[in-house]
Amino acid sequence: MTEKQQTFAEAMTALEEIVRQLEQGDVPLENAIDLYKQGMELSKFCHSKLQHAEEQLVSIVQETGETTAFDPLKGEN
Protein backbone atom coordinates (compact mmCIF):
# COMPACT_ATOMS: atom_id res chain seq x y z
CA MET A 1 0.00 0.00 0.00
CA THR A 2 1.03 3.59 -0.44
CA GLU A 3 1.46 6.21 2.26
CA LYS A 4 -2.06 7.49 1.50
CA GLN A 5 -4.80 5.54 3.26
CA GLN A 6 -6.39 3.30 0.65
CA THR A 7 -10.16 3.00 0.41
CA PHE A 8 -12.01 -0.29 0.11
CA ALA A 9 -13.01 0.58 -3.47
CA GLU A 10 -9.41 1.38 -4.45
CA ALA A 11 -8.18 -1.85 -2.91
CA MET A 12 -10.86 -3.88 -4.70
CA THR A 13 -10.00 -2.24 -8.03
CA ALA A 14 -6.31 -3.02 -7.51
CA LEU A 15 -7.14 -6.60 -6.48
CA GLU A 16 -9.32 -7.10 -9.55
CA GLU A 17 -6.48 -5.85 -11.77
CA ILE A 18 -4.04 -8.27 -10.13
CA VAL A 19 -6.46 -11.16 -10.62
CA ARG A 20 -6.94 -10.16 -14.27
CA GLN A 21 -3.17 -10.13 -14.84
CA LEU A 22 -2.66 -13.49 -13.14
CA GLU A 23 -5.55 -15.09 -15.03
CA GLN A 24 -4.00 -14.09 -18.36
CA GLY A 25 -1.14 -16.43 -17.56
CA ASP A 26 1.55 -14.50 -19.43
CA VAL A 27 3.16 -12.98 -16.33
CA PRO A 28 6.73 -14.12 -15.62
CA LEU A 29 7.02 -16.30 -12.51
CA GLU A 30 8.83 -13.70 -10.38
CA ASN A 31 6.23 -11.05 -11.23
CA ALA A 32 3.41 -13.52 -10.62
CA ILE A 33 4.74 -14.23 -7.13
CA ASP A 34 4.96 -10.49 -6.39
CA LEU A 35 1.45 -9.94 -7.74
CA TYR A 36 0.16 -12.84 -5.65
CA LYS A 37 1.72 -11.33 -2.50
CA GLN A 38 0.20 -7.93 -3.29
CA GLY A 39 -3.14 -9.59 -3.93
CA MET A 40 -3.04 -11.38 -0.59
CA GLU A 41 -2.28 -8.10 1.21
CA LEU A 42 -5.15 -6.38 -0.60
CA SER A 43 -7.46 -9.29 0.19
CA LYS A 44 -6.50 -9.09 3.86
CA PHE A 45 -7.11 -5.31 3.84
CA CYS A 46 -10.53 -5.70 2.18
CA HIS A 47 -11.53 -8.48 4.58
CA SER A 48 -10.56 -6.26 7.51
CA LYS A 49 -12.62 -3.36 6.13
CA LEU A 50 -15.64 -5.63 5.62
CA GLN A 51 -15.27 -7.10 9.09
CA HIS A 52 -15.16 -3.59 10.57
CA ALA A 53 -18.29 -2.61 8.63
CA GLU A 54 -20.09 -5.73 9.86
CA GLU A 55 -19.13 -4.94 13.46
CA GLN A 56 -20.63 -1.48 13.03
CA LEU A 57 -23.87 -3.05 11.82
CA VAL A 58 -24.05 -5.67 14.57
CA SER A 59 -25.91 -3.28 16.84
CA ILE A 60 -28.63 -1.66 14.79
CA VAL A 61 -31.01 0.50 16.73
CA GLN A 62 -34.56 -0.23 15.66
CA GLU A 63 -37.31 2.38 15.70
CA THR A 64 -38.38 1.08 19.12
CA GLY A 65 -34.95 1.83 20.51
CA GLU A 66 -34.08 -1.84 20.96
CA THR A 67 -30.76 -3.11 19.74
CA THR A 68 -30.72 -6.29 17.73
CA ALA A 69 -27.92 -8.43 16.45
CA PHE A 70 -27.26 -8.05 12.74
CA ASP A 71 -27.34 -11.37 10.90
CA PRO A 72 -25.95 -10.94 7.36
CA LEU A 73 -27.38 -14.32 6.34
CA LYS A 74 -30.92 -13.37 7.33
CA GLY A 75 -33.14 -11.37 5.01
CA GLU A 76 -35.30 -8.49 6.08
CA ASN A 77 -38.16 -9.38 8.42
From Swiss-Prot:
Enzyme class, UniProt record, top EC level: hydrolase
A Pfam short name: Exonuc_VII_S
GO annotation (BP), single: DNA catabolic process
GO cellular component entries: cytosol; exodeoxyribonuclease VII complex
Keyword Zinc: no
Cellular localisation: Cytoplasm
NCBIfam families, sorted: PRK00977.1-2 (NF002138), xseB (TIGR01280)
Protein name in the entry: Exodeoxyribonuclease 7 small subunit
Organism name: Lysinibacillus sphaericus (strain C3-41)
